[in-house]
Each structure stands twice: as structure tokens, then as C-alpha cells.
């Protein structure tokens, strides 16, 4: 049988804007019959130090130094000639070519933003050529699991100008039979939360990911308000809706002193662990991301040993979607879950490799957005393609977040009877 070979005939990029009004890269890949695939890369605010590197122009006269004309030029002048004539259906070879063309460990020569835009656009062009939805092209015939959404409705840390140390306080509507029902619950809780905050005199403007950023007395108060919103919206905490935290602990870690600053106090890893354990005992917390700094492996290992049988411990900055770092985490039993961000590693193939490695080792994978997003819905399809069971794509406001939720609604409808929303069963790495 002949392998389908459809030539890439053109690759081009342009500078477009992300949801923060900052420049980012959009790539277009054209195939021999005129089929086009287009993709826009996201950009993070709190970045792990081991992430693949996006290239910015640093010309202060344009976009305050955040332009991406160099990355665009790298696509048009270096990447395009190398990919033209290649088979659009050979994604691993396309991505290998991109990696070798760059030649650096962290994609700093051509830029992860240039490389990823092209990698995603090739996948989309191939799917479009076949007339297949993206999730089916990437995931094959068995792609059918709709993800449980982790919805970031209260922001702190580097995502907000308030006094909360933890970066994200999320609601997790896992106790439902379909994605559609879970999304509805999330939206209703979001609007109830808005009313509660408004009635208490808090500003209800939303941050980069669509969540609220109130000044509250403590991290614990944020959790209490979430519970209140869940109940007032008519749902049951710990049965239908749970709480997830993204601590982004590297952002409140003092490397010189080796301590964490939380709620105005210095805490050692051990004391911080106790602080989290108290919260877990009091509230229906089902998932905690980056509870410690990205180099504090020992704390991750100890914490997972203590609470990993009842809470999903997620590595984000710890792993940066990197198979090498993930392998270390698996060996050490550092976490029982990984956050997956395409632009942390920089190609579609490497992202799929990270998900596969996690799942093989009984770890869950959470497909995630970045704080600087766009109308591109690639990650919604990726979540279903990998049967990941989880997605983190922001709050219930701002079109660049809602775009992903709406795409998942379409996918659930398209899959019909074979669609699976596994709810609490998605947390297979903990004993729930």
C-alpha cells in the first residue's frame, strides 16, 4: 500500500496579536492542492525556567520590545525552504526537521514560537486535506474522551495585581455526565461568584485568563468564597464540583533563603506542606499544581508520598512538557500528573510524546492554555485526541477562553453516542 504523500508547497508566517495585545506568530502551511492549515501560538506570563524559548525582537520602538518579526523571518527564510517538498502527513519527520534545523536544546535559535506555529499549521493542513476534524487526525479512531475542565475563576500571583500568593483558584465540575452539563455548571458558578464579589464590594473586572482578582484576606478566603459560589449556584461541593489550585510556587520562593512567602509569612518546604495538608483536610481540593518551586524535587516527592493517593499533584514548571524532566519525575515519583503546554516544548510530536509517557506511567495529563492566548482552538482538539481527560483553558469569560469550550461542545455533539465524559473517573492516578 502506498503511503499518502501530499507535498507542502508553501510555508509563511505573520505577526498577529494575542489576547493581551502582544505580538505572536501565526503560520500558514499550503499543500499541493491548495489546502491551507493555519495556527497561532500562545505565550505565557509565568514561565518555567526550563521552557523552550520564544524569540522576541527586543526593539523598544515596536510593541515595547515584544515584536516577533525575527521569528516570522525565521519561518519565512529558514524553515520554509527546509519544509517545502516534504510530506504533510509525516508529522514526526516534519518536527524532527524543525528541531534539527534549530539545533539548540531550548529552541532558542529559531524560536519555539516560530517552530511551534509551523508544527501546528502542518498538522492542521493535513487534517484539512483529509476532511478530518483535528482531534480525529491527531488521535485516530479512538479519540472520544471529553475533558473535565479546570476553570480558573479567581486569579492571584503573577496573573493578578492583588494580595493572593497562589496563582489560580479553580472550580472543577467533575460530577456530571457530559461536558455540556459541566460547562453549564461552571458558567452558573462563575456568574454567582461575580455577584458574591460585587455584593461584598470587590471589583469584578477580569484578568488575563478571565477570572476575578479580588483583594482578599488570605488564600483560604478565596477557597471559602468558591465554596459559597458553588453552593449558592445550587451545586454540591465534593460531589459535583471540586476545587483545584495552581500555586505556581516558584513565584513566591526566595532562592537565596530557601523559603516560601505565603500569607505574609516565611515558610520552609516542610511548613508549606503542612499548610497545604490543612487546606486539603478542610476543603474539597482535588488537584494542586506546582505546590513547590521548580527545583524543589524533594518536596514534590515527599508531598506526593503523603497526599498523592487523594489529590492530583501536577507538575507544570517542574516538567515544562519535557520528556527528559518528566522521566526524572516518574523515576522519583515526584507527582502523579503533568500539565501539558505545547509552547513549553515547541512541537506537536514532542507534546504527544510527553502525554504518552505520562499515561503509560499511570500519570494524568492536563492539556493547558497560556495566559496570552488567541482564537486558535488547537488545544481543545488536542485534549480529545489524547483522551487526556482534563483541560485547563481559563474562566467563563473572554472569547479566547470560550473559543476552546465552544469547540469542545461541537466535538461532543459530533461524537454523539460515543462521546465519553469520565468525570471523577478521569482522576485515575488517585484513589477516588
Swiss-Prot record:
By which gene is this protein encoded? eno
**What cofactor(s) does the depicted protein rely on?**
Mg(2+)
Which PROSITE patterns does this one have?
ENOLASE
Q: Which InterPro entries match?
A: Enolase, Enolase-like_C_sf, Enolase-like_N, Enolase_C, Enolase_CS, Enolase_N
Query: What reaction does this enzyme carry out catalytically?
Result: (2R)-2-phosphoglycerate = phosphoenolpyruvate + H2O
Highest taxon of the source?
Answer: Bacteria
Name of the protein described by the UniProt record? Enolase
Identify the catalytic residues: 209, 341
Q: Which GO terms describe its biological process?
A: glycolytic process
> Could you tell me the EC number(s) of this protein?
4.2.1.11
